[in-house]
Amino acid sequence: MRRGPTGWEPPGRLEGERAWGQRKAQSILGWLRLSEPRHGISPTEGIVLLPQPDGTSAPLEIVLLAKVSTGFPGVVQLLEWRELPNDILMVMERPERSQDLKHFIRARGFLPEEVARELFHQVLEAVRHCTSCGVLHRDIKPENILVDLATGQAKLIDFGCGTYLQDTAYIHFAGTRSYSPPEWTHFGWYYGKPATIWSLGILLHQMVCGEHPFRTGKKISWDHQLSLPQRLSQAGALGRTLRAWSHPRKEKESLEKLY
């Protein structure tokens, strides 16, 4: 069983502990209504139905999650789904004691390199797994990463913005605007893997610095020069990667190796 580093448990009350809010269920199960509004999309607009081999149809989010979740620990497991008269119900695993990464970071201010390295590696493995299955998550951010506080296992959740991975450019954006790549901001298109690499760089910055690099009025662009804390080890992999990402036009060269 995986165990987290010393200090894995956050102090005091677990803000953001994953009870799934109104979605809570018993034991290790969590449930989610797909009709709940998200990302400013109305309930009915947010559900894309795909035809299935048996002649029925299924929501895209469920199809994508079914492709990537079975047997892989780094993605939340879809256990069952049901179509109700006015809702679609998803039943997923829910670690008994867990917290999303946003609140996991907030409880500490920032993550020590050892903890950040372990969690970031797990997220990378989950992203690699998804892309190998032909799935693009499109909304990688701390809120969509669940940390099992008992084992230290990170799980990628919420495929509501996901789609199939393609070699051609995407001309419709789905996800969180503050994680969108510069090419979308400047040109209105983006490619799946480079956009994922960009959001992973932002995620890593949040983990080791405790804040979003573009939340202080900085415009999302290639010409981003961000100051990094001196506590980051000069020889460490995270420090090298983040320093390359935080200087103009170097992030592709350094982060594309993640794939």
Over which residues does each language-model region extend?
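AlphaC helix of the protein kinase catalytic domain
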Residues: 100-110
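Conserved activation segment of eukaryotic-like protein kinases, specifically the C-terminal portion
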Residues: 171-184
